[in-house]
Amino acid sequence: MILHNIHAWLICLAISVTWPSAADWPTYRHDNQRSAITAERLKLPLAKRWQMIPAQPPSPAWAKPAKFDFFVSPQSRKPLVHRLAYDHAYHVTSVGDRVFYGSSAEHTVHCLDAHSGKEKWVYFTDGPVRFAPSIHDGRVYTGSDDGTAYCLDTTTGKLIWSYTAGSEKNTLIPNDGRLVSPWSVRSSIAVDSGTAYFTSGFFPHEGVYMNALDALTGKVTKRQHWKQHHLNKGSFQGYMLLSNSRIYMPGGRSTPFYFDRLTGKSLGQFAKGNGMGSFALLADNRIFHGPADRSGGVLTEAGLSGDKAASHTDALDMIVDARTMFLLTTSKISAMSRSSRRTLWNKSIETGSAMALAGETLFVGSQDKVSAYNAFNGRLLWSNEVPGQALGLTVANGALLVSTDTGAIISFGQATDHPSAWILF
């Protein structure tokens, strides 16, 4: 009976998501639903292959959480969970033999050799690049705080096209010692079915542009391409989600908004006060968003139109497959049945911060460490040291790539693959 259940669980895991490629990790958390799930399986134990330490660590847009919430009475206020911690590490994507990341400190997009960590090319923008690039059909899609979306060639790094949504008003203004555009691209770029989607702007009173461009040309050429200006709707910041018919956009210090994918028109906002922040995950008919509400840390589970279904207290990361929900807090990993909501296993952990599911292995990042657990029973399989808080995990083409808050990117793989190397930029 146990073997039968394991077999069924693995089958559900394999078919729960349509993968762009079993080996690649072409966008943040693998896909435009931000599942953080890949069918790739890494053979354990892993060994450090290379470690890249940049000249400058990340320069976050919001280094610390707000001091307090004005909407909560002084008697009820608690320490705030950071709602805008989307750029505290150099999150990476990886396709084939290449690794890509953007730098908020150097205003650049980088391409590294996946086997050695050596730089293949670098592209300079005029503002911080805060989100992981998206890779699609041999092209790199990224946005910058200079107010421009860029499409680059994956092989050479040469510019194919650029697009500035607020071009008629696109001036640079001071922000924490840097010059940024009021129309900064703070959504990442999501590419699907020949269209590139992103937002421009983060001041509600100035309005925010929602954009859908031809991914090949960077132009508004067909009916499904558009540019919509939304005034006083919110400050959209975080990684965009796509369903077949809708766009879901984290609201930063508010709850997510959702839009019609065909027209870009606003369809509504999730229930206010529940699950605010830059984290969002789409799984079947559920959206998980947070990691905070007005009472403290929580990930909110909601229907596709924002109707609240459940709250997951203190959870700061989640992975949801066909049958199981994996929840991470700073002190615990939990696996829960989606159907019965019964806890399958718990594991204590110190300073947990990120997860990725590769086959039947759950990788977990924490302070100065990355670990691997059996996803079925929670048994610890492997761990290794990393420099700093492991905030980003990518599994691609035989490697585990770890991004930390120091700016380091570390590649783990089979010890016999390539000699270990330290790369200093």
What does each of the following model-derived ranges do?
Residues M1-N5:
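N-terminal secretory signal peptides that target proteins for export/translocation
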Residues W25-R29, V81-V109, Y123-Y150, G177-N211, ...:
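Repeat-blade elements of multi-bladed beta-propeller folds
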